[in-house]
Regions:
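Active-site mouth of glycoside hydrolases
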Residues: 64-79, 85-88, 92-334
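Extracytoplasmic/secreted cell-surface and envelope-processing proteins
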Residues: 138-142, 176-179, 335-336, 368, ...
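Extracellular glycoside hydrolase catalytic/binding regions
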Residues: 69, 240-446
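Aromatic-rich peripheral "rim/lid" segments of glycoside hydrolase catalytic domains that contact
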Residues: 346-353, 359, 412-585, 614-672
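Low-complexity, acidic Ser/Thr/Pro-rich repeat tracts that form intrinsically disordered stalk/linker regions
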Residues: 53-59, 673
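Solvent-exposed beta-strand/loop surfaces of large extracellular or lumenal domains
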Residues: 586-617
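Secretory targeting and sorting signals
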Residues: 1-55
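Signal peptide processing junction and immediate N-terminal pro/mature segment
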Residues: 49-55, 257, 326, 449, ...
Length: 673
């Protein structure tokens, strides 16, 4: 999961019932607090296959479908086939893959995958997921890929694609492999198959005085040795049905990855395959042990990056040439504990271009520890941390994605979760704290793509025999090393419901922008217990705008047209931003209750309209269409979107429009790249 060394509410009820095995499983609480140990260790060391969205009269929307769904890297941003800037937002699906109960897959079957995807789209408006895969299950015997496992994975990915979600698969590992751990161990891992561990001849796993599971990364000699052997491509002697073979362990992994990717490419239709964004080769890479004279930076340069180049070549051979590799640096490169941070961030990789994406995780190790940060997160808490992610992506000339972030939802630091997660989403949206966003919006920066850890519909209902021990059946929370981070669970009737404030998770965000985003901020008014968290207040110098927003939720987007597409700018509308009451104030006009989108050919009948999200029956999006005559390259556009907590008059909307126009004109936004 995420920075494994340290880490790790409801919108309207989903009407979808999620069919799941074991609905009567007990909700045991189990042991908690497996997160502080990692800190100690560090210090010690448009939709594809689903039916297209339709206009009011029933005709398909012209800009949806494969062209909208297909995503590529374009400089420091993702773009779709229309040339619109794309933001990917969603969840990891899911930590269930790290368990054995569903055979190394996120779901018991495709039906559960469909129900989970529908709930994710309905309850959060997410448009992308990181889909976890297991090397151990893909290659249970050396050189023999389990096509049945890959078929089941393909079926589950298909269900997600058909719900309008984009997918990037991830061969996941934590602590290298569960097969390193004996049946009575306090800890477990996931990743490599049994044969690779048995052939390695590793010492009996022991973390010594470890308090929590993350310490195994730097203190468990078995984990360190196995990880080191993977990166050095140690040749293992393994027994097979055809006799004894010599198997370089990294080569075996690359062979399996290539066959997995080829399997997916061959069994997904072309339209569905368009929804596959790329591939994440290896979760949270770390050397295990550095060679003599080696450090974190030289390890990235001489070991990790050549691995990515080898994986990139396998992607090309498997039919993934046009999809980027999601390259993650040394997992400790952006630790927010100074004594734990290691130099890295692919500093010596040069410009990556469209063949790669800068892929990183971020967790507040200080907050998770319960020792290094007292109190709650505050406005702007992580803008510097995620600003560093933006800076590295710009230096690498590639898009960035934060493919894991989050905070525990139970345990002695869980009271921090509402503020920590709000501050993380804030920093994904903008470089600026709310206190300075209105006065310095030109410094806001690009909106980051991200996937929260995690989305597991079986949360609290597992039945996992830890390390194969039938006397240690785990049911509570994530059923994995005492973690509890799933944003979703099933209620007593089997419906998927959010475990965190829906105002936090169901967010306004720019899914597709016809041009380049210059500034974005969303005030979600999420709650910390009974306290409303308001970090971005409209300034007193804009009284009409402040009055229009009131105490409701609102977001502001400023973008610069590049004159290259007539496809509309698209923002997800959270629950409560209903078509009948949401208010939009923009240079394109003002409206309360945007009408359904209709068009004459490719010309929108209304510059401000709404429509269903592709692949859904209740999630909606706002569509902003600038008339061609007023949308030349370099034209600045803006839109304030409020949730309709009050019904503003046309006069108030017009006054707010004048204030916003003056604010944009005086903010110093560039009109050219």
């Amino acid at each position: 999961m995420a920075i494994t060394a340290v880490r790790r509410g409801v919108r309207r009820q989903s009407r979808v019932r999620v069919r799941v095995r074991g609905l009567t499983r007990p909700r045991g609480r189990g042991r908690r607090g497996a997160l502080l140990g990692a800190a100690l260790a560090l210090l010690a060391a448009g939709a594809v296959a689903g039916p297209p969205a339709r206009a009011a009269e029933g005709a398909p929307l012209w800009f949806d479908g494969r062209t909208a769904t297909e995503v590529s890297a374009d400089g420091i941003r993702f773009t779709d086939g229309h040339g619109r800037e794309v933001v990917l937002r969603g969840f990891n699906v899911s930590g269930e893959t790290k368990l054995e109960e569903n055979g190394g897959l996120p779901f018991a079957d495709a039906a559960d995958a469909r129900a989970s995807a529908t709930a994710l789209r309905s309850l959060t408006g997410g448009n992308a997921v990181r889909f976890l895969l297991s090397w151990a299950h893909a290659e249970p015997e050396p050189g023999k890929v389990d096509t049945g496992y890959l078929d089941r994975a393909t079926e589950q990915i298909t269900a997600l694609l058909d719900a309008g979600l984009r997918v990037f698969p991830d061969f996941h590992q934590d602590l290298f492999s569960r097969h390193l751990f004996h049946k009575d161990s306090w800890y477990t891992g996931d990743g490599a198959p049994r044969w690779a561990v048995e052939a390695g001849g590793y010492p009996v796993e022991s973390c010594g005085v470890c308090v929590l599971w993350g310490q195994n990364i730097t203190q468990n000699q078995a984990v360190k040795n196995a990880t080191r052997d993977f990166w050095t491509n140690r040749v293992l002697t393994v027994g097979t049905s055809g006799g004894v073979r010599s198997v370089p362990v990294q080569d075996a992994f690359l062979d399996t990855a290539q066959k997995t990717m080829a399997h997916l490419a061959g069994r997904l239709t072309e339209d569905r395959f368009a929804g596959i964004v790329g591939f994440d080769p290896y979760n949270e890479p770390y050397a295990g042990e550095y060679a003599t004279g080696q450090n974190s930076r030289t390890w990235e340069r001489d070991t990790l990056w050549p691995f990515y180049e080898r994986f990139r070549a396998r992607m090309d051979l498997a039919g993934w040439r046009d999809k980027p590799l999601f390259a993650e640096p040394n997992m400790f490169w952006n630790s927010n504990l100074d004594l734990a941070r290691q130099e890295g961030g692919l500093l010596d990789a040069g410009a990556l271009g469209k063949r790669y994406v800068f892929n990183t995780h971020f967790y507040d190790q200080k907050a998770i520890s319960g020792v290094f940060m007292w109190g709650k997160a505050k406005d702007g808490q992580y803008t510097g941390d995620l600003g560093t992610v933006r800076d590295r992506a710009e230096a690498l000339d590639t898009p960035a994605i934060v493919s894991e972030f989050g905070h525990p939802l139970s345990g002695y630091t869980s009271d921090k979760a509402p503020t920590v997660d709000k501050a993380m989403y804030q920093a994904l949206d903008t470089r600026l704290p709310g206190s300075t966003w209105w006065t310095q919006p030109a410094r806001s920066g690009p909106v980051l793509s991200a996937a929260q850890w995690q989305w597991d519909i079986y949360s609290g209902r597992h039945r996992e025999a830890m390390n194969g021990n039938s006397d240690k059946i785990l049911t509570a929370a994530d059923a994995w090393n005492d973690e509890d981070l799933s944003a979703v669970a099933l209620d007593s009737s089997g419906r998927a419901v959010l475990r965190q404030d829906a105002r936090l998770l169901d967010r306004l965000y720019p899914g597709a922008v016809a041009g380049r985003t210059l500034a974005f901020s969303y005030e979600d008014r999420s709650r910390d217990a009974g306290t409303v968290l308001t970090w971005n207040r409209v300034p007193a110098t804009m009284p009409s705008t402040a009055r229009l927003v009131g105490d409701g939720r609102y977001g502001v987007l400023v973008w610069r047209s590049e004159g290259a597409t007539r496809a509309p700018t698209q923002l997800h509308l959270p629950s409560g931003f209903t078509p009948s009451s949401a208010t939009v104030v923009s240079d394109l006009g003002t409206v309360t209750g945007p009408p359904d989108y209709t068009a004459s050919g490719r010309t929108a009948d209304h510059p401000i309209a709404s429509a269903l999200e592709p692949g859904t029956t209740d999630a909606r999006r706002l569509l902003l269409s600038a008339p061609a005559a007023a949308d030349g390259a370099g034209t600045l556009h803006y839109a304030l979107v409020a949730d309709g907590s009050a019904a503003p008059s046309a006069e108030l909307r017009a006054s707010a429009q004048r204030e916003l126009a003056a604010w944009v004109a005086g903010a110093g936004f560039p009109v050219a790249p």
